[in-house]
Each structure stands twice: as C-alpha cells, then as structure tokens.
C-alpha cells in the first residue's frame, strides 16, 4: 500500500497547483476589455481545471480521512474548506442569472453593443455583487484552508521526510 505521506504529498501538490489556475483564470477576465463568449470559455477552462485539481484530492482523500483526525488544525482546515465551497455556491447564484441575461441580449457574440450591464436587468447589480462577494470569499477561505493544510502537513509528516 502507498504510504500516507506519499498520498498527502500528492494531494498537497495538486491543491497547490490549483492556485495558479485560479490566478490565470482571473487574469483573463481582468485583462479583457470586453468579455466575449470565447473569453469566458477560456477563463472557465482554467477555473474548472483549478477546481478539479482542488476538488479531486478533497473528495478522494481528505474527506474520507477527516473523521479519523478531528481536532485542532483538522477542524479549522475543514471549516475554511467548507466555507470556501459554500461561497463558491453563493457566487454561482450570481453568475448563472448574469450568463442568462447576457445571452438573452446576445452580449457574448455581439459585445460591441452599447449596453450598460446594469440596464439589461433590474437585478444585475445584485447578481454582480453576489458573484464578486462569492469569488472573493472563496479565494480568501481557500487561502486560509491552504495555509492550515500546509501547517497540518508539516506538523504531521515532518519526521517522515
């Protein structure tokens, strides 16, 4: 059987590798003058890659081991990890209606229309606020969970290296 430290190391590398995907995905949107459908798909490819790199170790290895390790860092690490995913779900309550409204106005395929986003739907500013709050909250909770996870890794496996 594979040693626990090996599996933990692979999980740590995969979760850590997700962060550059998030950063580059964010940069694609920040750098775009207008967000076309192609830009959005390019952005989402990196975001989904980051989510996959992060979620697979969580579901396959961390969650099954959590109840055997409850205490201190493990509880905090799990708490902030769950909060990160909860805030991601909150962000989705903003992005889904935004996507629907922008597609209705054909703003992804014809982005040159002179339309203020807040004018295409009465709730657009609320949806955009949900999206921003959810994404910022996800990233902040993810970073705290990552730091706690690294601290747990170092304290648990430092004698095995």
Residue map of PLM features:
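Short, strongly hydrophobic alpha-helical membrane anchors
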Residues: 1-6, 159-161
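Membrane-water interface of transmembrane alpha-helices
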Residues: 20-26, 89-112
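Membrane-interface helix-boundary motifs at transmembrane edges
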Residues: 30-44, 70
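A generic, lipid-embedded transmembrane alpha helix
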Residues: 42-67
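Alpha-helical transmembrane-segment detector that highlights a single hydrophobic TM helix
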Residues: 62-99
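Short membrane-interface loop/juxtamembrane segments of multi-pass integral membrane proteins
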Residues: 108-131
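Juxtamembrane boundary at the C-terminal end of a transmembrane helix
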Residues: 146-161
């Amino acid at each position: 059987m594979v040693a626990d430290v090996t599996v933990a190391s692979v999980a740590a590398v995969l979760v850590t590798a997700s962060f550059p995907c998030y950063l580059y995905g964010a940069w694609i949107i920040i750098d775009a003058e207008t967000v076309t459908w192609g830009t959005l798909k390019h952005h989402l490819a990196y975001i989904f890659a980051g989510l996959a790199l992060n979620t697979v170790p969580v579901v396959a290895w961390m969650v099954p081991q959590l109840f055997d390790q409850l205490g201190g860092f493990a509880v905090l690490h799990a708490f902030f990890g769950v909060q990160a995913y909860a805030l991601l779900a909150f962000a989705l309550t903003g992005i889904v209606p935004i996507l629907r409204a922008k597609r209705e106005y054909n703003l992804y395929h014809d982005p040159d229309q002179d339309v203020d986003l807040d004018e295409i739907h009465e709730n657009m500013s609320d949806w955009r606020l949900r999206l921003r709050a959810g994404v910022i909250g996800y990233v902040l909770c993810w970073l705290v969970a990552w730091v706690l996870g690294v601290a747990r890794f170092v304290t648990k496996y430092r004698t095995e290296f």
